[in-house]
Design a protein with these regions (language model features):
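Substrate-binding cleft and catalytic face of glycoside hydrolase catalytic domains
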Residues: 1-89, 108, 114-116, 159
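Aromatic-lined carbohydrate-recognition surfaces of secreted/lumenal glycan-active proteins
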Residues: 52-58, 90-136, 190-207
Length: 224
C-alpha cells in the first residue's frame, strides 16, 4: 500500500523533508496518530485473515533527499561527496520515517492477537554511489540504518541502467548489489539473514531501451 499522509495538519508540511525545515512536534504527532489509526484499522478489520500489508509512505526516497530523479536521469554522473544528500534533509527524513515506524509498531503491539501483519516499507531508488564510496550519503546508508523500516524496497531504475551497460558481463553485479542493500538494513526477526529487501519497482519503462536489454535484465534479475 502506497499510503501518503492525509491529515491536513501534516500535509501542509509534507515538503519539509525536502526543504530541510525541521518538523514541529504538532506535525509529527498528527503524522503518528494517522498511521497508528490506519495500522490499527488494518489489524482489527482483517484480524482473522492472515493478510500481510506493506505500507510505503514515501517512494523513491533518494529523489526527495538529493533532488535527482533517477527514473529519467539514466546517467547519474560521477560519484563525489558533492552528490551527498544534505544533512538537514537526512535528519528530516529520519524524523518522518521513524515517527511512522513507531506508530505502526505501537499499533501492532497493542493488537498482537491479530493474525494479520503490517510492515513498514521504505523505498530507495539510488545506492551505487554509496556502495562504492561510503562517504557519499544516500538513503541506504544515512536513513535506512536509523529509521526503523521493516522492509527496504528498491526502485530499480539505476540498477537496470548500470547492470545493462557497464556491468553487462558481470554475473555477480546484481547479487553484490542486493547483498550491499541487506548489509545496510537492520536485521528483522520476521526476515532473518538479511531477507528484508524487496523489489518495489523493477525499473523497466515502456517504449524505452531495447527489448534485448529488457529480456537480459529480467532473466538475470530472476536468476539472482
Amino acid at each position: 500500500l502506497t499510503a501518503y499522509p492525509l491529515n491536513p495538519t501534516f500535509r501542509s508540511a509534507s515538503r519539509k523533508e525536502t526543504s530541510g525545515i525541521p518538523y514541529t512536534q504538532e506535525e509529527l504527532d498528527s503524522l503518528s496518530q494517522e498511521y497508528y489509526d490506519f495500522t490499527k484499522y488494518l489489524l482489527s478489520n482483517y484480524q482473522d485473515s492472515k493478510k500481510v500489508f506493506s505500507i510505503m509512505p514515501v517512494v523513491t526516497m533518494d529523489r526527495w533527499l538529493s533532488g535527482r530523479d533517477l527514473a529519467s536521469d539514466e546517467s547519474p554522473g560521477v560519484c563525489t561527496e558533492s552528490d551527498s544528500a544534505p544533512k538537514a534533509r537526512i535528519d528530516n527524513m529520519i524524523a518522518y520515517i521513524s515517527t511512522i515506524s513507531n506508530a505502526i509498531h505501537r499499533a501492532a503491539q497493542e493488537n498482537s492477537a491479530s493474525k494479520s501483519k503490517v510492515y513498514l516499507t521504505c523505498e530507495i531508488n539510488s545506492f551505487t554511489c554509496a556502495q562504492n564510496n561510503p562517504a557519499i550519503k544516500q538513503a541506504i546508508n544515512s536513513v535506512i540504518p536509523h529509521a526503523g523500516c521493516d522492509l527496504v524496497g528498491l526502485a530499480g531504475y539505476e540498477l537496470l541502467y548500470y547492470s545493462s551497460t557497464a556491468h553487462r558481463n558481470d554475473p555477480n553485479f546484481l547479487r553484490q548489489a542486493f547483498n550491499y542493500l541487506a548489509s545496510q538494513a537492520p536485521d528483522h526477526p520476521d526476515f532473518p539473514g538479511g531477507k528484508n529487501i524487496v523489489i518495489s519497482e523493477v525499473g523497466l519503462r515502456e517504449q524505452q531501451g531495447t527489448q534485448s536489454d529488457a529480456d537480459w535484465f529480467v532473466n538475470t534479475f530472476l536468476k539472482t
